[in-house]
A protein has these predicted regions:
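Cytosolic regulatory regions built on CNB/CRP/Popeye-like sensor folds
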Residues: 1-172
Length: 172
C-alpha cells in the first residue's frame, strides 16, 4: 500500500518495529499487545542499495514493512524494459498478497538505498491468526481495505492511460 512519504519521512528511524507496525495502514487498528505479537513473528532484514528484494514471477511467502530507506516497484514490459510503477517509503509495505495466496509475485522490488525492513513469513503469519479470530478479522479487514485502494488506484491509472490513448488517436 502506498501513501505519501510525509506520514513518516524517508530514513527516519524509530525505537523498534512496533512503532512502525502501529503507523502501518495494515496494523494501525491493533492493540499494543496485538502489535507486539505481530512484531514477534517478524524478522529484521537489511538490504544494500540496488538489491533486488522480490522478483516478479517468483513465488512469494513474505510481507515486508519498510523501517528505513525506500524502494522502487517495477514491472518488466514485453520489450524487457523496466517500468517503475511506484516508490515506497518508511512505513509502507509490500508483498502482503503473498501472505494470502500462493501465486507468483506481480512485480519486482529493488532497494533505492540501504534499507531496513521487517519481514513476516506466511507460515508464521497464518499460525498467529489461527490462534486469534479477533486479530485475524482486524488484519484481514485491513488487507481488504489495502487491496481495494490498490484496485482503485489501478483503475484510475487504466482510465487515464486509456483516455490518453484515445486522445492521441484523435490528434493523429
Amino acid at each position: 500500500m502506498t501513501r505519501s512519504p510525509s506520514r513518516r519521512s524517508p530514513g527516519k528511524d524509530a525505537m523498534d518495529s512496533i512503532d512502525y507496525l502501529r503507523d502501518s495502514l495494515l496494523f494501525e487498528e491493533l492493540t499494543e499487545e496485538e502489535l507486539a505479537r505481530v512484531a514477534a513473528i517478524g524478522r529484521e532484514r537489511t538490504f544494500e542499495k540496488d538489491t533486488e528484494i522480490i522478483r516478479e514471477d517468483d513465488m512469494g511467502d513474505s510481507l515486508f514493512l519498510i523501517l528505513a530507506g525506500s524502494v522502487r516497484v517495477y514491472k518488466t514490459e514485453l520489450s524487457k524494459e523496466e517500468e517503475v510503477i511506484n516508490t515506497l517509503y518508511v512505513g509502507d509495505h509490500f508483498g502482503e498478497i503473498a501472505l494470502i495466496d500462493h501465486q507468483p509475485r506481480s512485480a519486482t522490488v529493488v532497494a533505492n538505498e540501504a534499507c531496513r525492513m521487517l519481514e513476516i513469513k506466511r507460515d508464521d503469519f497464518q499460525r498467529l491468526l489461527e490462534k486469534d479470530d479477533a486479530l485475524a478479522l482486524k488484519i484481514y479487514r485491513a488487507f481488504v481495505q489495502a487491496l481495494c485502494q490498490r484496485i482503485r488506484e489501478t483503475t484510475e491509472s487504466f482510465v487515464f492511460l486509456k483516455t490518453m490513448g484515445n486522445a492521441s488517436r484523435i490528434v493523429d
